[in-house]
């Protein structure tokens, strides 16, 4: 069956139960050198621009979700306005530290309001402090591994990115 996959240029990605890819069988996507070349040739300025676009999409989505609340308290209305003000600053961020700060501030507003009805207080990754944090952690893990599998499938270098850098 693997030979048939190769004949028809089908790549088989095997995932663990948490969606972490552990084996890719078939046509090696690492040969997609044009994609990787474009990925590596991005300047710092271009990568910062891409990171800003990603954060703008994320934060606009969070703002949209907050705006959809039916009965908005005065506090929520004020925080929606504050979120709008921060979003306007994102295109002008001069570096990753500023961008991370804007993202953090909006996320704090979003999570504090969006999950208020379930008595959620803060994000605690890997702490398993309560059911919402446990479920968020599981969901983030699945999402991260699934996206990683898709990126590997297309040939991206998962260790060279535009935003969360180490």
What role is predicted for each listed range?
Residues 31-166:
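Active-site helix-to-loop segments that bind/position phosphate- or nucleotide-bearing substrates
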Residues 1-38:
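Trp/Phe/Arg-rich N-terminal binding region typifying the photolyase-homology
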């Amino acid at each position: 069956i693997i030979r048939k996959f190769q004949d028809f240029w089908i790549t088989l990605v095997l995932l663990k139960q948490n969606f972490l890819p552990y084996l890719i069988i078939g046509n090696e996507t690492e040969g997609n050198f044009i994609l990787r070349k474009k990925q590596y040739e991005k300047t710092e300025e271009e990568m910062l621009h891409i990171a800003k676009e990603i954060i703008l999409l994320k934060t606009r989505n969070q703002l949209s979700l907050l705006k959809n609340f039916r009965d908005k308290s005065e506090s929520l209305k004020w925080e929606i306005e504050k979120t709008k003000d921060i979003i306007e600053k994102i295109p002008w961020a001069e570096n990753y530290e500023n961008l991370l700060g804007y993202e953090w501030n909006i996320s704090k507003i979003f999570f504090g309001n969006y999950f208020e009805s379930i008595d959620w207080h803060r994000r605690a990754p890997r702490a398993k402090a309560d059911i919402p944090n446990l479920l968020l952690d599981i969901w983030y893990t699945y999402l991260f591994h699934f996206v990683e599998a898709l990126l590997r499938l297309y040939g991206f270098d998962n260790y060279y990115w535009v935003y969360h850098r180490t």
